[in-house]
């Protein structure tokens, strides 16, 4: 796929990814790979893979899980990605915030790189144990990855992620969230947010959720969100959860209230929540760790192997996530 090879020890690689219209030309992202025992040699036939995705404005694992804990407790290779627009948001200009679109492509390409790299080296691993998690912006990218790769993940854990690109966040409206994605309402502006662009980024989109279910989506989704979160508004997370349930997806939610605050895992009902690593291990571990009552394996081949298009219609056309080459590329087709 790429010239880079899997490192023998914990390390980083740079992989090619999809072009960004705001900066035409080849684009690469940095991928951080963390092995059980910090060594590729420690990977065994039960080892899984987990995307561990940083927050809006962060890099590597900021706002996400501690990879040394995840690799040990869950027996996984942890994969973090400096996806599009990683790093300080206030220091960036010239484009609105991608909000999980090409960011998900970057993360999924990193996952495919490790998946295919293990296969190329003929290293046994458990390809039925594939997960994603992230905090805040990383929770958003986690759920967008699940949307763009509906056959790939065994389970995903969204910790206080953005459920949708609301008008409030897109246009920095007064009141509401403090987030500002810097989109424009002017159809002639390069920063214009199209109707479809908003619809594809809506993770509680009832029509798209029904399509995921119809395609045989079997991923366990866990949403962990503070009931007092005003940054990624709690009401949006609650609505997304209800829409996922209504579509028949396998989803559960932990909406953190004052009664849950233990000073250890849950320290706040706001956006920061508490110890996100332990949330992944303790709550996500219920279905990720072998031997637990809710433990499960995925039955379907991954999108990496299926090499089929995943299509989401919108009011102005359709989005096609093409897996034909075993790595994803997304495009919009106007109607």
List the predicted regions and their residue ranges.
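Phosphate/oxyanion-binding active-site loops and adjacent basic polyanion-contact surfaces
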Residues: 22-29, 99-108, 232-233
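Short, surface-exposed "cap/lid" segments of acyl-processing enzymes
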Residues: 28-73, 80-91
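Active-site loop/turn elements of alpha/beta-hydrolase fold enzymes
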Residues: 81-85, 161, 258
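Alpha/beta-hydrolase active-site loop
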Residues: 95-122
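C-terminal catalytic histidine-bearing segment of alpha/beta-hydrolase fold enzymes
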Residues: 238-335
């Amino acid at each position: 796929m790429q010239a880079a090879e899997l490192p023998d020890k914990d390390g980083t690689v740079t992989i090619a990814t999809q072009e960004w219209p705001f900066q035409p030309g080849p684009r690469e992202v940095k991928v951080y790979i963390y092995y059980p025992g910090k060594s590729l040699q420690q990977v065994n036939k039960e080892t899984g893979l987990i995307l561990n995705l940083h927050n809006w404005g962060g890099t590597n694992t900021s706002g996400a899980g501690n990879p040394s804990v995840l690799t040990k407790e869950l027996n996984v290779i942890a994969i973090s990605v400096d996806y599009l627009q990683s790093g300080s948001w206030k220091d960036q200009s010239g484009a609105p915030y991608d909000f999980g679109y090409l960011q998900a492509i970057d993360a999924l390409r990193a996952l495919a790189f490790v998946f295919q790299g293990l296969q190329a080296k003929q290293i046994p691993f458990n390809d039925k144990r594939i997960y994603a998690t992230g905090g805040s912006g990383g929770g958003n990218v986690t759920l967008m990855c699940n949307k763009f790769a509906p056959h790939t993940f065994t389970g995903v854990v969204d910790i206080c992620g953005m459920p949708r690109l609301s008008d409030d966040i897109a246009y920095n409206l007064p009141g509401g969230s403090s987030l500002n994605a810097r989109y424009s309402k002017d159809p002639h502006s390069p920063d214009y947010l199209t109707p479809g662009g908003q619809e594809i980024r809506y993770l509680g989109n009832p029509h798209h959720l029904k399509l995921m279910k119809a395609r045989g989506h079997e991923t366990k989704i866990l949403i962990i969100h503070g009931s007092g979160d005003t940054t990624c508004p709690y009401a949006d997370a609650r609505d997304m959860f209800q829409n996922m349930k209504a579509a028949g997806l396998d989803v559960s939610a932990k909406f953190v209230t004052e009664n849950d605050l233990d000073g250890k895992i849950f320290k706040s009902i706001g956006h920061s929540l508490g110890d996100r690593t332990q949330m992944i291990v303790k709550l996500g571990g219920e279905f990720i760790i072998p031997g637990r009552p809710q433990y499960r394996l995925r039955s379907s081949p991954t999108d990496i192997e299926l090499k089929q298009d995943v299509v989401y219609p919108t009011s102005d056309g359709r989005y096609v996530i093409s897996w034909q080459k075993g790595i994803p590329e997304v495009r919009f087709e106007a109607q």
